[in-house]
A protein has these predicted regions:
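Conserved SF2 helicase motif VI
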Residues: 251-269
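Conserved helicase ATPase core of P-loop NTP-dependent helicases/translocases
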Residues: 192-227
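Residue-level preference for the first positions of well-ordered beta-strands
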Residues: 76, 160-162, 221-222
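Inter-lobe coupling linker of SF2 helicases/translocases
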Residues: 2-133, 149-152, 274-342, 346
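A short beta-strand element within the Helicase C-terminal
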Residues: 235-248, 273-276
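Conserved strand-helix element at the start of the C-terminal RecA-like helicase core
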Residues: 103-114, 156-180
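Conserved helicase motor "Helicase C" RecA-like lobe of SF1/SF2 P-loop NTPases
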Residues: 167-200
Length: 348
């Protein structure tokens, strides 16, 4: 085989020929500081790598296909953290320090627990304790206001919207969840309850087909769901005018699938909106950063353009993740540095 001919049958040989580890300063998972992290994040000899890959793969990307899809306007909505959120993030920082020093047993607390709690705090503190107050300026409430505005503007054409949230899905167990909270607020503001649906209620293929039909006709105008249940295979684009991302997954493909629900053939709208909601100074920044690292890695390979000899730059999609990371960190100098990095990359 080609790998045997080129003596690349072992991963170490392949890695030394095509890759390099790089060390970069990145946000710590607890969101309160920075750390140096070494990762495999740079490719060399890309033309040779891609010619080998194309022996077994045929790559077609969106920029090659020129499909008649709506133009998407991306908007990052940054919510200021409440004092309570700031306190809770600081508490996570202490937990992370204890875990890192080994003073806490992994069965009691670990970084996975800290990360999950960090995601919850960034979304809504009531996920940590339902008795805590509802912050009127939270990203959840800002999202509700945006949904209401677009719902009102699209009444005549019965335009529809999707809300993605992988955390706090409805379980019907009486506990607080953001799905029920959003619906309650929309109904209180005048949206008919029958126009709001959860994908989780369609638990059979027949129910799902009926629900999708209602969204396409505009009878259901606000549909909430998770990436797993409302990602691939959800064909409801006919009247879709906006998608709202209340949280972010770990894989770039998750965001591609989410946005693919609206940036799709068969949409009557020429322009659509994609909202990314982040809470400044919380784990949101770390999550977008993780996504950026993964997207950069993928983008260097899955491109329709002729690859350069080596690559570590970010593409447009990855750059939007970088911008969000800077906005979230609450430090404008990070954003300025990233903008300068991009300019330097272009000049090179």
């Amino acid at each position: 085989s080609t790998l045997q001919q080129k003596k690349l049958t072992h991963f170490d040989c392949w890695a030394s020929t095509f890759g390099e580890t790089t060390t970069a300063i990145e946000l710590a998972p607890e969101g309160t500081g920075y750390r140096a992290r070494t990762r495999f994040a740079k490719f060399f000899n890309l033309p040779e790598l891609m010619s080998m890959f194309k022996e077994v793969a045929d790559i077609k990307t969106a920029d090659q296909l020129h499909l008649p899809v709506p133009e998407a306007k991306f908007e990052t909505v940054v919510a200021k953290p409440s004092d309570l959120q700031k306190e809770m993030v600081q508490e996570l920082s202490k937990r992370a320090a204890e875990i890192h020093s080994g003073t806490v047993d992994a069965s009691v607390d670990n970084m996975l627990c800290v990360t999950n709690d960090g995601r919850k705090i960034g979304l809504d503190v009531r996920l940590m304790n339902p008795m805590l107050p509802d912050d009127p300026n939270s990203k959840l409430n800002v999202c509700v206001q945006n949904v209401l505005k677009i719902w009102e503007e699209g009444k005549d054409q019965k335009l529809t919207q999707l809300l993605f949230c992988d955390l706090s899905t409805p379980k019907n167990d009486g506990n607080f969840n953001v799905y029920d909270d959003i619906r309650k607020k929309l109904v209180a503001a005048g949206v008919p309850e029958n126009e709001i649906e959860f994908i989780h209620n369609a638990d059979t293929e027949a129910k799902k087909a009926a629900l999708f039909s209602k969204v396409r006709s505009g009878d259901v105008r606000v549909l909430l769901g998770s990436t797993a249940k409302m990602g691939a295979g959800t064909n409801v684009q006919s009247r879709l005018v906006a998608v709202h991302h209340l949280d972010v997954g770990w894989k770039p493909s998750d965001m591609t699938q989410r946005n693919g629900r609206i940036i799709r053939q068969g949409n009557m709208n020429k322009e659509v909106k994609v909202f990314n909601y982040v809470t400044e100074g919380t784990f949101d920044a770390y999550l977008w950063q993780t996504l950026e690292n993964k997207q950069r890695f993928i983008s260097q390979i899955m491109t329709s353009k002729s690859p350069v000899r080596s690559c570590e730059d970010v593409d447009e999609q990855a750059l939007s993740y970088a911008e969000i990371k800077a906005l979230c960190a609450g430090n404008p100098l990070i954003k300025e540095k990233m903008d300068l990095d991009v300019q330097v990359a272009k000049l090179k």
